[in-house]
Every structure is written in structure tokens, then in C-alpha cells.
Curated annotation (Swiss-Prot):
Entry coiled-coil feature ranges: none
Organism of this sequence: Influenza B virus (strain B/Bonn/1943)
Designated gene of the protein: HA
Full protein name: Hemagglutinin
A GO MF label: host cell surface receptor binding
Main subcellular localisation: virion
Quaternary context: Homotrimer of disulfide-linked HA1-HA2.
InterPro entries given in the database record: Capsid_hemagglutn, Hemagglutn_HA1_a/b_dom_sf, Hemagglutn_influenz_A/B, Hemagglutn_influenz_B
Extracellular side: 1-543
Role summary: Binds to sialic acid-containing receptors on the cell surface, bringing about the attachment of the virus particle to the cell. Plays a major role in the determination of host range restriction and virulence. Class I viral fusion protein. Responsible for penetration of the virus into the cell cytoplasm by mediating the fusion of the membrane of the endocytosed virus particle with the endosomal membrane. Low pH in endosomes induce an irreversible conformational change in HA2, releasing the fusion hydrophobic peptide. Several trimers are required to form a competent fusion pore.
GO biological process: endocytosis involved in viral entry into host cell; fusion of virus membrane with host endosome membrane; fusion of virus membrane with host plasma membrane; virion attachment to host cell
Length: 575
């Protein structure tokens, strides 16, 4: 038997946090209240588009071509000639149908509006200095090169697109289809984008210009793609695109993409617009829908939110295409555990007693310390002292950082792998891109959520292990100078003020230094038996007599029960 009387101090281990618990999801325990969390998601707000940090970003194809659409630049409108800067990223800012301020074009008959987008997809773009075909002497000629007042040049004279030559035959006669080969004239490794087309008008104008008022046939072939056209005769109202003279005629414009060293062919009749200067393009530029102007810089360009600066690894909200150092879309907000399981003080006081409540309070939050720090606290006459254990805290931080980095690296790799596969597929099934992109996003989101659940499980278990290790170290340092009262707390045989606690945190504590006579120590006195005049023999006699009597009584009782059970003895009870 031991009697404990004390006026000593208590020292407890714990982890700091806010007083309010946080909830995280785990793989096997479901939702768990923890002492701290790291938010992993943010919900962005809409902003203007910007230049991507550290990356050449292209807005307009030709920034110095004023009052020109990107289609003007792509077709080589006389007043819209200029250099296209190199760029790793291009912003598709012309989302509505765009016209060209030149001769009226029948946009709906071809994919010509896609030409600027095609060019945006290249990092390096240049217009050839020489013509790919000698238009005057092409098959079916000789030709006179036509111009139009609807397409004024820099001196406001009649002009035409730099990428095409309007081949008006000198001999006004009908012509069977003829073929011209389009040679590859770009540098090795460049794709050649060759623009061509044809002109059609009323029967009267077709007869006057070409000597044939019948519909004409045209065919292009390059890179395994064949396209056929038949011209439409008449029925056009007088109009112009943006400026210049109104025209009753129309032009149909198309393009072919020629891979390195691969020629193309064009089969045509009257009204041909022969290829002239060609676009030579190389490298890849990522394209994203957006708007101009580009203001400032951003980590990420997002089709729905504009320019974003990454503050969290993941985001919730609208999913859309994004490029750059972007957060990854997830369905629901995610939190990473940054502490131990939360234990409410009131519950601990009821179930584990006063000292259990103290331990729970410490794990629930210490005032005056940064959230997430491991350390010690002492309670006594000096009040409350708190000291952080830097080594244990750093180990915990490293563990959480490792989980966070591993989580990020894992998902970035998955994103890159899935994106790469889907981008390749996208080239074959463009019409399914949005559905494929949604499927990709859902897949990645599910993987991220599972990874966070597993990480939370590991972090919570790891934090509990850190606290147990901290408790073992404290017990070893205190040695016989303290009594383990459970729940990470010890009652010391000496006072432990802030200096004492700092020594413990620094691992330089010496019990002898604080076990001075001036301190009130833990008084433990053995219980003693009072002497009432009885010696040891008398006590032993009393004990043996009582034991013998008890044994005899038990034997008699057992015998009576046995006899009654065999009907050898009857027992009657009378009142």
C-alpha cells in the first residue's frame, strides 16, 4: 500500500493546434477529427488573361498589324503583313466567326476559319520569301495576275492576298481539269501550310473573265487528305468583307498541310487562285481559348477563370482546359491532416479523469505556440510553461511535407501521362474532345481523392507515433524523478518551471539540477502497521486459527450438499 502526497508539477507531451477540431477523410476510418489540417484546394474567381510566367505567350498572330484580324494575317492581306513572334503558348481570342477585310469569302464552304488556329498551334511561324508556284506560267496559262479594289494595298491601290495569285487566263476559253504540283520549299523539319482557292461569279462575269460560265471543278491532295469542290455560279448580292469596293463575286479559300519533303497537288479549271507564299511552321505551341489584352503574368491560364496564380495544388469549381503551372481540378474540397486525432477535453475528463483531460487539452491546442508544433507543457505554482521540441516537430513536418510532395508528384505524373495519351487521341477524334476531357478530369479527381485519403491515414498514424516517441523520450529523461500518470503526463518529484521545460525540449535536462532541497518534493511514505501489543506469534496464531475454521466449515457444507443430493439426508425448514 502506498500513500501519495504531493505539491509537485505535472509535465505532459502534446501537439499544438487551434482549439476547434478539423475534419479530414481517411481510407479506413472515414471522417476523423484532427488537431490541424492543410487545405489543399481553392475556388478561383474570374480574372483577365495574362502572359504565362516564364513562357513566351502569343495573343494576336501579328502584334504590330493594327486593325487586322488573325485571318487577315493568315491569308496575307496586303495591309496586314508582319512577323509572327515565336511562342510556346497561344491564346485563341477570336471566338466568334471572323472575316477578312478583303475580297468576300464563302467561309461556310471550307475550313478556312481554322487556318489562324492551325498557325497558333506552332511555336515558330514564318511566311516564305519566294512563291511556291510561278502563277503566270502555270498549267492552263498563260495567266494575268488579277487584283481587286476590295483588297487595297499599302498605297490604297488594287491588291490581293500574298498567299494566292488570282490566275486570269489570257485566252478566254474553257479548259478541262489540269494538275499542278505544289513543291515543298520550307526548311527541313518544318510543316508547309499552302493556301489556295478559286473564284466564282455570275454567268456574265465568268464568261468575261474566263470564257466559261459553267461550274468549275477543283481538287486538292496532300498528306493523305483529298478535298473536292464545284464552284457555284451566280446568285450573290454585291458585298465586301470590311472595306473596299462591293463585289458580286465570291472566293472559296482552303489550305493543305504538307509534311517535310512531301509535295501536294491541285487539280483545277478556270478561276483558280494558285498558291504563292506559304507558311513554314515548326515546334508546338499550346492553344487555349481566352481574351485580349494580356495583362501582367500568371502561373496558369484557365479557359473559365483567366490568369491564375497557384496557391494550392488543387481547385474546385468549373472544370476547363488550363495550361501552365496549374492547380488540378477535383470534385470536392480536400484537406491533408496536420496533427493527431482530436480528443475533446470534456470527454476525456469524464472517461479518463483529470489528467486525461489535461492531455486532451494539450493535444487539442496550446495557447502561445504555432499550430502543429510538438512539445511539452508543465503545470504548477509557476503557472503554465510551454516549450517546443524542435527535433520532433521537424520530423513531423518532414513527414507531412513528404506526403504532400509525393501526392503532388504522383498526380502530376498521372496528369501528364493521361494528358499525353488523351492529346494523342484528340488528334484522331476531335469531336469527342470535351467528353474525353471530362472523363480524364473525373479519373484524375478520383485518383487524387484516394491518394489524399491514404495520405491522411498515414499522417494521423505517424503523428500518434511521434507523440508516443516523444513520451518515451520524456520518460527516459525524467527517469526516477517523476511518476508516469498516463496519457503522456508525468508528475515530478521536483518543480519544473520554464527553464526546466526548455532544458527538456533541448534534451539537456538533468534531474539532479532541479531536485534541490528548496523544491517541494513528491512525498511517498510507506504505510506502517500500528503496534497494539500484539507480537508476531500472536498475529500468526490468530491467522492460522481463522484459516483452519474456514476450511472445516467448507468441508462440512460440501458433505451436507452431497448427502442431500443422494437422498441420504433430508432437510426440513420450519418457520
Amino acid at each position: 500500500l502506498m500513500v501519495v502526497t504531493s505539491n509537485a508539477d505535472r509535465i505532459c507531451t502534446g501537439i499544438t493546434s487551434s482549439n476547434s477540431p478539423h475534419v479530414v477523410k481517411t481510407a479506413t476510418q472515414g471522417e476523423v477529427n484532427v488537431t490541424g489540417v492543410i487545405p489543399l484546394t481553392t475556388t478561383p474567381t474570374r480574372s483577365h488573361f495574362a502572359n504565362l510566367k516564364g513562357t513566351q505567350t502569343r495573343g494576336k498572330l501579328c502584334p504590330n498589324c493594327f486593325n487586322c484580324t488573325d485571318l487577315d494575317v493568315a491569308l496575307g492581306r496586303p495591309k496586314c503583313m508582319g512577323n509572327i513572334p515565336s511562342a510556346k503558348v497561344s491564346v485563341l481570342h477570336e471566338v466568334k466567326p471572323v472575316t477578312s477585310g478583303c475580297f468576300p469569302i464563302m467561309h461556310d464552304r471550307t475550313k478556312i476559319r481554322q487556318l489562324p488556329n492551325l498557325l497558333r498551334g506552332y511555336e515558330n511561324i514564318r511566311l516564305s520569301t519566294s512563291n511556291v508556284i510561278s502563277a503566270e506560267t502555270a498549267p492552263g496559262g498563260p495567266y494575268k495576275i488579277g487584283t481587286s479594289g476590295s483588297c487595297p494595298n499599302v498605297t490604297n491601290g488594287s491588291g490581293f492576298f500574298e498567299t494566292m495569285a488570282w490566275a486570269v487566263p489570257k485566252n478566254k476559253t474553257a479548259m478541262n481539269p489540269v494538275t499542278v504540283e505544289v513543291p515543298y520549299i520550307c526548311a527541313k523539319g518544318e510543316d508547309q501550310i499552302t493556301v489556295w482557292g478559286f473564284h466564282s461569279d455570275s454567268e456574265t462575269q465568268m464568261g468575261r473573265l474566263y470564257g466559261d460560265s459553267n461550274p468549275q471543278k477543283f481538287t486538292s491532295y496532300a498528306n493523305g487528305v483529298t478535298t473536292h469542290y464545284v464552284s457555284q455560279i451566280g446568285g450573290f448580292p454585291n458585298q465586301t468583307e470590311d472595306e473596299g469596293l462591293k463585289q458580286s463575286g465570291r472566293i472559296v479559300v482552303d489550305y493543305i498541310v504538307q509534311k517535310p519533303e512531301k509535295p501536294g497537288t491541285i487539280v483545277y479549271q478556270r478561276g483558280i487562285l494558285l498558291p504563292q507564299k506559304v507558311w513554314c511552321a515548326s515546334g508546338r505551341s499550346k492553344v487555349i481559348k481566352g481574351s485580349l489584352p494580356l495583362i501582367g503574368e500568371a502561373d496558369c491560364l484557365h479557359e473559365k477563370y483567366g490568369g491564375l496564380n497557384k496557391s494550392k495544388p488543387y481547385y474546385t469549381g468549373e472544370h476547363a482546359k488550363a495550361i501552365g503551372n496549374c492547380p488540378i481540378w477535383v470534385k470536392t474540397p480536400l484537406k491533408l491532416a496536420n496533427g493527431t486525432k482530436y480528443r475533446p477535453p470534456a470527454k476525456l475528463l469524464k472517461e479518463r479523469g483529470f489528467f486525461g483531460a489535461i492531455a486532451g487539452f494539450l493535444e487539442g491546442g496550446w495557447e502561445g505556440m504555432i499550430d502543429g508544433w510538438h512539445g511539452y507543457t508543465s503545470h504548477g505554482a509557476h503557472g503554465v510553461a510551454v516549450a517546443a521540441d524542435l527535433k520532433s516537430t521537424q520530423e513531423a513536418i518532414n513527414k507531412i511535407t513528404k506526403n504532400l510532395n509525393s501526392l503532388s508528384e504522383l498526380e502530376v505524373k498521372n496528369l501528364q501521362r493521361l494528358s499525353g495519351e488523351m492529346d494523342g487521341l484528340h488528334n484522331e477524334i476531335l469531336e469527342l474532345d470535351e467528353k474525353v476531357d471530362d472523363l480524364r478530369a473525373d479519373t484524375i479527381s478520383s485518383q487524387i481523392e484516394l491518394a489524399v485519403l491514404l495520405s491522411n491515414e498515414g499522417i494521423i498514424n505517424s503523428e500518434d507515433e511521434h507523440l508516443l516517441a516523444l513520451e518515451r523520450k520524456l520518460k527516459k529523461m525524467l527517469g526516477p524523478s517523476a511518476v508516469d500518470i498516463g496519457n503522456g503526463c508525468f508528475e515530478t518529484k521536483h518543480k519544473c518551471n520554464q527553464t526546466c521545460l526548455d532544458r527538456i525540449a533541448a534534451r539537456t535536462f538533468s534531474a539532479g539540477e532541479f531536485s534541490l532541497p528548496t523544491f517541494d518534493s513528491l512525498n511517498i511514505t510507506a504505510a506502517s502497521l500500528n503496534d497494539d501489543g500484539l507480537d508476531n506469534h500472536t498475529i500468526l496464531l490468530y491467522y492460522s486459527t481463522a484459516a483452519s475454521s474456514l476450511a472445516v466449515t467448507l468441508m462440512i457444507a460440501i458433505f451436507i450438499v452431497y448427502m442431500v443430493s443422494r437422498d441420504n439426508v433430508s432437510c426440513s425448514i420450519c418457520l
